[in-house]
Amino acid sequence: MELAHSLLLNEEASNQLGAVQKAEFIFEWLRYLEKLLLATNREDVREKQKTLVGQLLSLLNSSPGPPTRKLLAQDLAILYSVGDTVSVYETIDKCNDLIRSKDDSPSYLPTKLAAVVCLGSLYKKLGRILANGFTDTVVNILKAMKSAESQGRYEIMLSLQSILTGLGAAAAPCHRDVYKAARSCLTDRSMAVRCAAAKCLLELQNEAIFMWSTDVDSVATLCFKSFEGSNYDVRISVSKLLGTVLAKAVTAKHPGAGSKQSARRVSLEEVLELLGAGFLRGSSGFLRASGDMLKGNSSVSRDVRVGVTQAYVVFVSTLGGAWLEKNLAAFLSHILSLVSQSNPKATQTQIDAVCCRRCVSFILRATLGGLLGEKAQIAAAKEICQAVWRLKKVMDAALSDGNVETRLSSTDVAASQHVLVCALQELGNLIHNLGTTAAPLLQDSSTGLLDSVISVVLHPSISVRLAAAWCLHCIAVALPSYLTPLLDRCLERLAILKSSPEAVTGFSSAVAALLGSVTHCPLGIPHGKGKIIMTIAEDLLCSAAQNSRLSLQRTQAGWLLVAALMTLGPAVVSHHLTRVLLLWKCVFPASPRDLETEKSRGDSFTWQVTLEGRAGALCAVKSFISHCGDLLTEEVIQRLLPPLPCAVDLLTQLSSILKTYGSSLKTPSIVYRQRLYELLILLPPETYKGNLCVILKELAAELTAPDTQAAASTCLLPALCHPDDLLILSPLLQETDHRFIEEQLLLGNGVACGSLEYDPYSIYEKDVEGDSVPKPLPPALSVISSASKLFGVVCATVDEAQRVLILEQLLNSIKHTKGARQQTVQLHVVSAISNLLKYVAGSKQSLGPEVRRLVLTLVLGALESPTPLLRCAASEAWARLAQVADDGAFTAGLAQLSFDKLKSARDVVTRTGHSLALGSLHRYLGGIGPQHLSSCIGVLYTLSQDSTSPDVQTWALHSLSLTIDSAGALYHVHVESTLSLIVMLLLNVPPTHAQVHQSLGRCLNALITTLGPELQGSNTSVSALRTSCLLGCAVMQDHPGCLVQAQAISCLQQLHMFAPRHVNLSSLVSCLCVNLCSPYLLLRRAVLACLRQLVQREAAEVSEHAIMLARDGRDAAADANLREVGLEGALLALLDRETDESLCQDIRETLHHMLTSMAVGKLTLWLKLCKDVLAASADFTAVTCVDTMQEEEGDRGDDASVLTRGDDKPHPFSNPRWATRVFAADCVCRIINQCENANRAHFDIALAQEMKKRDSRNDFLVLHLADLIRMAFMAATDHSDQLRLSGLDTLLVVIRRFADIAEPEFPGHVILEQYQANVGAALRPAFTSETPPDITAKACQVCSAWIASGVVSDLSDLRRVHQLLVSSLTKIQAGKEALSQLYNESASTMEILAVLRAWAEVYIIAVQRHKNHKQALKTTVNSEDSMRNGSSSAAGLLDLVCTDLATLSKLWLAALQDFALLTLPAEFASQLPTEGGAFYTAETSKSAKLHYHDSWALILHAAALWLTSTGFADPDEGGANLSRPVTPTSMCQGSSSSGAAVKSPEDVYTDRFHLILGISVEFLCSLRSDASLESIMACLRALQALLDVPWPRWRIGSDQDLGIELLNVLHRVILTRESPAIQLASLEVVRQIICAAQEHVKEKRRSAEVDDGASEKETLPEFGEGKDTGGLVPGKSLVFATLELCVCILVRQLPELNPKLAGSPGGKASKPKTLLEEGSRLVAAALAILAELPAVCSPEGSISILPTVLYLTIGVLRETAVKLPGGQLSCTVTASLQTLKGILTSPMARAEKSHEAWTSLLQSALATVLDCWSPVDGAQEPDEVSLLTAVTVFILSTSPEVTTVPCLQNRCIEKFKAALESKDSVVQMKTCQLLHSIFQYPKPAVSYPYIYSLASSIVEKLQDIARRKPEDATELQLCQEGIKLLEALVAIAEEEHRAQLVACLLPILISFLLDENALGSATSVTRSLHDFALHSLMQIGPRYSSVFKRVMASSPALKARLEAAVKGNQESVRVDPPSKHAKNLARNSSIQLKTNFL
């Protein structure tokens, strides 16, 4: 193929190829040429133009296929536009000659067609350059058309369209000729020709004024004729033509009088009348022929009506939303008049009426629902409301008129009913779509919307009553706050008007519809409504027999209410189940004998009532089983079963009842049968086992009954066909935007579409996806559907013999019927058989050989049926039969049977049926073995090339695609030949056969999937395959059919998945963007599915290509939004107007992927998009309020720019719907989350501003804070409740992410501070009385987050938001009864708990701040101002909360008590309070539990803090209220009047203690994987707070089992949660438990001492763990549990501490390591706990644990003793030294019973520390300073007998000596500091050996430094520490030795002095040393004056030096204290001050 990539065709290469390859080669060359010509230099093209034209014309003569000729024509046109146009006329003449040729042979046809296409392309591209001779060309083409076949006519029409496009107004001379030709083609028998003619006329009307002026009526009539017998594509094309022409007629500015063309003005009324005439009378009506309009007797065919319906939509869409707003009244009036009494012909039969109503609803939905913004929709709803009122008044006047002559007849009532049905359905749809934004509409008293809808609930027509009920359903779904009031109103009217038949039917339907809406309203309805409804239903059923006029209505209404009640689910129904089952039992006779008696009584009417009642009962039970599965226990099933046999018996008697009482019972009997079948389908077959044979016979009779309708196929069969197979059938079976109206064309003209009045029970069922109003089919069709489904179940359950009998019966029925009747029976039987096979396969059963034979015979007959849908269903059954048989031989036999049929048959029916059967076999059995695969492919190859029948080709290719899919790797050997076949067909099949191209596309897709990743290969064969795939895609992309283009995109998507490098992303994205707004739903879906895949990997590239396409502007078809807002904005705009849910989901996912990949990089673009969407509708006063607030804040540079944006530019998003705005708000949150994982500067304004200055392209989120706040504000204050929730969510995210960011311009402040007013304004509306609870709950969360964030420090500002919480608290104090009764009780629970949770969060933060403030007061000294501000803020917040704390504490404890009850296991359910808890009712406990789970943790923490603050004693409380479970009556009131025993305060405290502890332990015990970090932390902090107070500590300390249990729970938490925060908090609780135990032990010891007297101390019992034996029992010991937990923490951080690991090979040589900060803190906390343990033990017990504690402490020291700069000690070393000191100073070390053992163990420990110096196996040497410090701690903290043992003491001295001789000055210095402490130790036995051994070394060290002078600060510090050490020695020396020491010290000090000269030039180090030495001398002189004088006298040199120094430093001498610098040095160098463990 590379040879094809040249400017001239490589003829040599192409001639060497076979026919198929040559066609491919030429096509590839033409594709390449198209791109090359546009990119090549004009001169180079002209140079080779002549040759190129010759080559192209030669190809023209070689019979090119359709895609090739199209590409050839384009290339020729581009060539002339780029090169010279000199020879263009010559080329045109050649084309004309080819067209004139008399050769009519089929082989010459492609050449003629190619010439036609070339002419069109040349004129389109070159336009007016060719204007001279175009008339000849047009005349020639039109002449050729007269003898052309359909393909020729098709191409000629498209060619004329191209000529008109190119020439524009210059083509005027030929306009009439073209118009005439196109007129005839518009009614052509070929649908493709009609489409082409419509396109041609659409182009013509741009310039031909007569089309939309003088000839407008004839154009309309022509279009109406074109609709007759049309297909979907024709209706789309022609309706576009008609709608556009009429829109032009209305809006066009007509030329003046001087114009040559006379033009007639056409008014809107005329245009609407014209369309109306077409709708009502088809093509027989004319604009001016009013007489003819009155005659129209014949019914208009449905396809004309559907076409006109689409034309209406195109007409209004072309004029646009703004036009519709202006002309709304006229338009609405006209559309509704189409089904009014002024046009009775349209609705003369029920079938016609239903179809017309559908069309009118579609027009209204597509225009009012699709084109208008929310404001205009509200106006439209008002207009509809007025129409309803007008009709209602007319109806009322007519019905109340006493004059019989003037009263409306029943036909008039029937006529007006259809207008009302359409109006009410559209009103419901509008409100449903508006959601809560429709609130102003319902509140507008002048409109009276609710009154008008409720008033028509009493309309005489059942259709209107049901439509009104459905409208109420829509209102309730849209505005949940209206649900309960509407329900109350309808129930009230039902109770009052129960003697009116219309009222009973109407209001029961309304109640049922409202109950159906409850599932869509998360807040629900009050639980008590169920009881009221059940009572009314019972009353209706019981009173039905009292009044025969109302019997039927009351019976229907009663059961409808019961059935609808079931949708409320088990929680409600469980309370009424007994009553329902009783009603069910009573409705059927108790025995067969009673049924027989019944038959002999009554009349037609009583039987009608009976059947309706029983059908209703069956429906109610079906509803119960569907919606209350949880209640379907074995016991309930047993109670349901008794009436079933009787119900089945009645089924068998129906035919005789019908004979007896007449045909009036026909419909009730059908409905009864349908209801019974539906119920039996839901029940397990075992439950009606005894009746199976009877049921089966009845079903067989039902399926073969003589009066069944023929049109059931379209209802029954699609569900039984595979969805993929439906694509090859009628396009009507595919999903389209027009499905709602196109559906009716599937049914025959004699069959009605679905409509609500056919089954009133469907009014409460869940909405069918994508449909607004339920559309149940007529009972006659529905019963067949149910019967065939039940047949599958029953036939699979009966025994084999019974099956054989029934199947033979069915087979005979088919044989004994003829014609259409036979088809109908066959259809029913096949659907039943399909259901049987489906059920058998699903239940893994099998069929016997005889049954298989019979099934095969039945299916084989259907496989050759003339009905395509039946053939399709039969092929599915064929494959399922093989699947069920699961027998290779049987399957092979089936395949062989099809092969034989295909080889012999020549008719289309057999060939299509059996080819699909082969494909289905492959699909279900994964291929039928390699031996059959080749035969199958061979047969399908042959069939797919049968050009005489496009149907055969389509089915065969579809079957081939199934074969490829299922064969998998086995197919690889056939890939090349199949691909060659596909490409050959793609290049040759005419474009008019779009269905063949679609099947080819599916084959190509299957091939690409089979090849998979192999397509990435680089070898020649793979490259050739890939090129062929791409070529195939290119052919399909260029096909005019949208569904073929969808296949092309799908193939390219697959190719991109497997070989992304080889797919041209630019052209693919271009193709996707162009088709983004295609009128074809399946194409839009393919586009979005592909885009979604692309952006997952290459979002930025896709976005860039889209922008390039928009800039290029060559493709006008690309969405205009692309130019303004890029692909992202175009997708958002598409999301706003798209109605298909799966497509919307794809759009959302695509945008999410793009946002994830690009939001951080394109921050401004994304935020602007979101802001534009949110601001486009923010036209409420609230928004202006933000702007004024912002203006007061002054200029803030970049941030504020958005707030002052002028709105002079038009919005790219006009009136976006609320759902789009919610999505935009969600995107804002996602953007913030994305930025969190990106650059730190996104949340640091100073850094962001600095980086922005550095590079202006940098963009950071923090710079857009004003935008974020504004967007959150706009959303939070919208009319839409969903958007308000999203806005509050966004605000919450903004507060949490930005609260801590400091304001660089105002230190001490944060950037969010300036938005206080905005936050307050956004929150305030959420606290009004009419706000739904979910919004208030979310607002409470935002309030608490705002207060807790610390943004606001000023109390007056804080009080504004605080006041909102106060108002909520006041509201909930009244308890659950007083809260809103609009919603379910669980909604009140949610609101109450949200308020309490918010207060809890605020209280927790207030206490925390107060605590921090108090600590700050202790530790720091701040300036007076900052102290004052901080204290006022910290204390002020606490004071604000404390005002309400008395109330809050009670509510918190009540909520916790509720939570504790709700979390009890199920076995305690019987013990729960029957009335529920404080904040929930027993009935709603299940749903309430979820709300408690969200809130309990913070409430628990707050309650624990409150109890801590009161010390468990509430000063305001008598101790009686909260000692027992809080009930609604006692929650906030005084003591109960029941006389219950008053508990003591002690009991109250105990209850509270156990409540807090119990909830905490229960939660921590069984932590679920989804338990949040916040909940666990809150729980642990609650325990910490609890244990901060003495009384709870005493409880824990005195109950050892409780302490152990709590420790075990904490141990589990530490094991299961890795979070350091959780582990630290757990350790803090452990520490508190140990402290509690210590306190308890101390108290017991003190008590014992006091009680027994001090004199008897020796005989005191031992307290503490271990008692006298020292034994610690695991599971019974608090200390042991603590040790386990601490070991767990330490070993996790330092695995080397594990004794097993330490003993393993290589385990000993470990390198000391530094832990991370979190790990260090954990280790320190564990060590601190270890230090406390000995105090909890008895002396013997302490001996037991001491080795472990010492091992762990010294282990930590050893493993973490890492050298740090400056001799610092690591955090863990410091902790281990502190622990060591705590242990060494423990009283147990001195206790008589343990002293000896402790001494021995401590000596061992010291020896272990000393051993640490000896590294094992080359491990790194540990830090000497750390180990020396540990040794020093031992020397100073233990009794002398531990450390004065010679062997230990000598080793210690050696270590110090070695350290003094270290080369590291820091080590020497630190050693001097440690020795300073030892030398001063008061006991000589300890200190003297060190002085004797080390003093001389120190003196030598100082003398050495004195000689060479210190060089740096470290040596200076060493020198100073050495001098201090000698000074200390002087101080402690005995008098007789002191002189010697002073004499030794003075020369050293004096040697450091500098004289006056040297002082000036001294370094800072020598100067500091001079000052230090001089200061020391000044102190020693007076203190030891005699020695001082003696030394001075004996050494004149020293004296002279001293004097010189003093003289040179007189200033220093005069100042008594040393310099500040020296002071600091002295302070810094003392380790005692740094760490306090010595």
Curated annotation (Swiss-Prot):
First and last residues of every HEAT repeat: 850-887, 1082-1119
Arranged from A to Z, the UniProt key words for this protein are:
Phosphoprotein, Repeat
Residue numbers carrying Phosphoserine:
1647
Fetch the Pfam families from UniProt.
HEAT_HEATR5A, Laa1_Sip1_HTR5
**Residue ranges of region Disordered?**
1646-1668
PANTHER family, per database record:
HEAT REPEAT-CONTAINING PROTEIN 5A, HYPOTHETICAL HEAT DOMAIN-CONTAINING
State the similarity comment. Answer: Belongs to the HEATR5 family.
* Name by which UniProt lists this protein: HEAT repeat-containing protein 5A
